[in-house]
Amino acid sequence: MKKTIAGGVWPVMITPFTEDNRIDYDAVLRIIEWYDKNGVDGIFAVCQSSEMFELSPQERVELAKFIITNTPKHMGVIASGHCAEKVEDQIREAQTVIDAGVDAYVFISNQFAKENESEDVAKKNIEYLLDHIDGDMFGVYECPAPYKRLLSPELLKWCAETEKFAFLKDTCCDLDQLEAKCKAVEGTGLKIFNANAATLLRSMEMGCAGYSGVMANFHPDLYVWLCKNYKEQPEKAQELMNFLGAASMVECQVYPVNSKYHMNLVGVPMTLQSRRQDYKLLTGSKKLEIEEFCAITETFRKSFFGK
């Protein structure tokens, strides 16, 4: 495996399904190609956006392997699927994905301890997982479900000092916390990726390495530009950030169904099937909102890039 992962944009990959509710691997390939076309740095596979809690253990592993195998070599792949109840099953699934060649296996932070348990318990359980999984690069995702466990700067620093952690998908959505976390891992190999669009620019100025969030399933190219150019073109970056922050409110709609509808609009065909929620919740008016969102994004894109 690589010893580090690239900064930049890592979309949280959605999972397309066939009409009879199987994983649509042809559509998975089309999504990978679309990510590549839009210049992202890597893919975060088998995460909450992938509906990992609704996938069987076998599906989680097979999906991860397929994405690892079919992603172009210039793009990275990290993957989770860390949602088995028994720790023995967690270890076995993680090892299978690592052995398939993933760049980093990503743990779910709420799996480290129960909601009422302390961070000391979480730390001991992290140590146990590291001792029983043969891998040299890991990540952590502060997944909101089934409950959100945010890592303290102190625990994050400890993770960095193990020299085995390269990735944190941070979901605190709070600039003060992000600044403290960035300071805690400064000079280490652990990179923090913000999942929150509105705070992204400020967080990168504080030291975050990039974006790993929902909106990279709508207009990843804009996030790629921001991550690559915010230092050299700060005024233009702020203009873009104003649009991205406002546009990110679309994730409060019927996600991930709305992203699947949007993918169809931009030439990546798939069904709207979802195991997380009824796709019919994306009503006619909500579809129209996504169509208008797509149109205004294109208008902004042409204005911003002068095309």
PLM ranges: what are they?
Residues 2-150:
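Active-site beta->alpha loop and helix N-cap motifs at the rims of alpha/beta catalytic domains
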Residues 55-57, 117-120, 180-181, 205, ...:
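Short secondary-structure transition/capping segments
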Residues 24-27, 31, 59, 63, ...:
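General structural feature for long, well-ordered alpha-helical segments within catalytic domains
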Residues 128-136, 143-255:
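Catalytic alpha/beta core domains of metabolic enzymes, predominantly
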Residues 8-14, 38, 208, 215-307:
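C-terminal alpha-helical cap/extension of soluble enzyme domains
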Residues 51-52, 113-114, 176, 201, ...:
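Short secondary-structure capping/turn micro-motifs that flank functional sites
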Residues 32, 64, 94, 182, ...:
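A generic alpha-helix structural signal
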